[in-house]
């Protein structure tokens, strides 16, 4: 085998590889011998089929397999002999092959860059520190109390307001006909809840208990009863009673409704999700700050092919968002401006990914099988009843498994860097933390 470097441009390399006819023939004969031992043909005992017969019947497929093996083996040998760390699979282009002759092909590769991470201990980061504010817990408790409200008569002399419950007999049309499915007495209708035909409840706002109202409405064109679709209808309605929702008191009794020993325990339970969101936001802010500083401090060349792949993924998602009307400000930008912007983002992501990978490699940071198993279980739980299929999918799909492993590895490397860096704390309010203008942006 003869290997010659024909081109070197940045991280790109191209090699010409020539495999001798003798080497090809050895692979062909080896494959024919394997078939001779296993193939079964009429008129021959197992393992006794002459090689000439095997070649006559299977020669074409055997040669194709031999050439494929020769290219795979020689390309692997070429990379190993030169100690090349490639970013992506080589691009192979067969230049020339005639039966019985040498095999000549070119191999194009992109190399991983040599990366020298900066001094991690010199990184200075600021970590926002926030606690759950009492007002947020109070608001949540108020919502819980409202959800456990009870109805009580309106005792004061006043007209019906939105949110009140007007007790009426089933609405009767001016013709004396009751509505289908609404026959009955003492029907509680919450005003403003849009339980009935649009406009009906609004015309009862302002009525008092004992008052009679004539209500005019137009039924929607898609109303389920054919006779009423799009019909202009007049109803005669008697408001028999007004009731109001009275929220439960925020006390130990309310806590016990939720299985808590006391109001203090309920406050802790209500505050827990808020604290979880604060932790997530703090982690996001610190990680974004860290990645920004790493990006500023490192400017090595990145493999163009990796940038192309990353950009294509970003661009496909953007096209879907543009079609769905969820692209926000991007919807009004020219295509070339968007491509320039997102190619820059793709290059940044690739550079940061390579940098984090190198830091992890140098410090022997590994993703354990237990961590992968936990991630698999979490993913499977997203598909109740299909857990077995999820596990089988990841078992058969190495790329999907790598996509599951990659964020775990990244988080472990980020945690390692944070342990090395100088991290100061800055107290902020929970409201300020949550108002981060880039809160929905991805960390990378």
Swiss-Prot record:
The lineage of its organism: Bacteria, Pseudomonadati, Pseudomonadota, Alphaproteobacteria, Rhodospirillales. Consists of 3 domains; the N-terminus binds the ribosome, the middle domain has PPIase activity, while the C-terminus has intrinsic chaperone activity on its own. It holds the Pfam family FKBP_C. GO terms for molecular function: peptidyl-prolyl cis-trans isomerase activity; protein folding chaperone; ribosome binding. It is found in: Cytoplasm. The keyword Cell division applies. GO terms for cellular component: cytoplasm. InterPro entries: PPIase_dom_sf (IPR046357), PPIase_FKBP_dom (IPR001179), Trig_fac (IPR005215), Trigger_fac_C (IPR008880), Trigger_fac_C_sf (IPR037041), Trigger_fac_ribosome-bd_bac (IPR008881), Trigger_fac_ribosome-bd_sf (IPR036611), Trigger_fact/SurA_dom_sf (IPR027304). It is an enzyme of class 5 (isomerase). It catalyses: [protein]-peptidylproline (omega=180) = [protein]-peptidylproline (omega=0). Its EC number is 5.2.1.8. SUPFAM superfamilies: FKBP-like, Triger factor/SurA peptide-binding domain-like, Trigger factor ribosome-binding domain. HAMAP family: Trigger_factor_Tig (MF_00303). This is Trigger factor. PANTHER family: TRIGGER FACTOR CHAPERONE AND PEPTIDYL-PROLYL CIS/TRANS ISOMERASE (PTHR30560), TRIGGER FACTOR-LIKE PROTEIN TIG, CHLOROPLASTIC (PTHR30560:SF3). Belongs to the FKBP-type PPIase family. Tig subfamily. GO terms for biological process: 'de novo' cotranslational protein folding; cell division; chaperone-mediated protein folding; protein transport; protein unfolding. Involved in protein export. Acts as a chaperone by maintaining the newly synthesized protein in an open conformation. Functions as a peptidyl-prolyl cis-trans isomerase.
